[in-house]
Regions:
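Core catalytic ATP-binding domain of two-component histidine kinases
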Residues: 1-196
Length: 196
C-alpha cells in the first residue's frame, strides 16, 4: 500500500513539474518573443500561450475552450504586440465572467481562415457591454472597472495594435447579461497589409 502511494505521489510530482515547466516556457516566450520586427506569427500558439500566462485570472471563474483551426496560416506581425492583444482579451473576458457572479462561466477562443485573412474570436458568458458605452470601449483611459482593477488601456492598446500596426479590424458583439465576443481579423501576408 505504501509503495502505491509513493508511486502516485511521484506521478503527481512529475505532472506538477511538467505544468510548472509549461508555464515558465509560456511566460518566457510571451515576455521575450523571438523578434521585435514583423515576422511570421502562429496565432494559435499566441492564444494558447496567453491563456497559460493569465490562467490565474480565469481558472476560478471560467472554463476556457479552444476551437482552433489547425491549418491556420501564420500572419506577418509583431509577435510581442499580438501576445499583448490576446492577453488583454482573455483577461477582460475573465473579468466580465467574474463580474457576472453566477458561478463558472465560459471563455471560448476560436480561429479560422477567411480568404486572405485570419479571424480570431474571444467570447465570454460574462456581463456584456451596455449599448450606450460600446462605441467608447476602444478610447484610451475609458474603463468601467473599479479603481485599481483597470486603467482603460487594454482595449485601446489592442485597437492600436490590430488596426494601426497590423492593418486589421477589431469589432465587438455584445448582449447585456449574456456576454461579449471580440472579433479580430488580420491580413495573412505583408502584401495585404500594404494594400489595406
Amino acid at each position: 500500500f505504501l509503495r502505491e502511494e509513493a508511486l502516485q505521489a511521484a506521478r503527481q510530482s512529475i505532472e506538477g513539474v511538467r505544468q510548472v515547466s509549461n508555464i515558465v516556457l509560456a511566460m518566457k516566450e510571451f515576455s521575450h518573443p523571438a523578434s521585435k520586427e514583423m515576422g511570421p506569427v502562429d496565432l494559435n500558439r499566441v492564444l494558447e500561450r496567453s491563456a497559460v500566462v493569465c490562467k490565474s485570472e480565469w481558472k476560478h471563474v471560467a472554463e476556457i475552450a479552444f476551437e482552433l483551426d489547425e491549418s491556420l496560416p501564420e500572419v506577418v506581425g509583431l509577435e510581442g504586440a499580438l501576445n499583448q492583444v490576446a492577453l488583454n482579451m482573455i483577461v477582460n473576458a475573465a473579468h466580465a465572467v467574474a463580474d457576472k457572479g453566477t458561478g463558472m462561466g465560459k471563455i471560448t477562443v476560436r480561429t479560422k481562415r477567411e480568404d486572405d485573412k485570419v479571424r480570431l474570436e474571444i467570447s465570454d458568458t460574462g456581463t456584456g457591454i451596455p449599448a450606450h458605452i460600446r462605441d467608447r470601449i476602444f478610447e484610451p483611459f475609458f474603463t468601467t472597472k473599479d479603481v485599481g482593477r483597470g486603467t482603460g488601456q487594454g482595449l485601446a492598446l489592442a485597437h492600436d495594435i490590430v488596426v494601426n500596426k497590423h492593418h486589421g479590424q477589431i469589432r465587438v458583439k455584445s448582449t447585456e447579461g449574456e456576454g461579449t465576443t471580440f472579433i479580430i481579423t488580420l491580413p495573412i501576408d505583408a502584401q495585404d497589409r500594404k494594400a489595406a
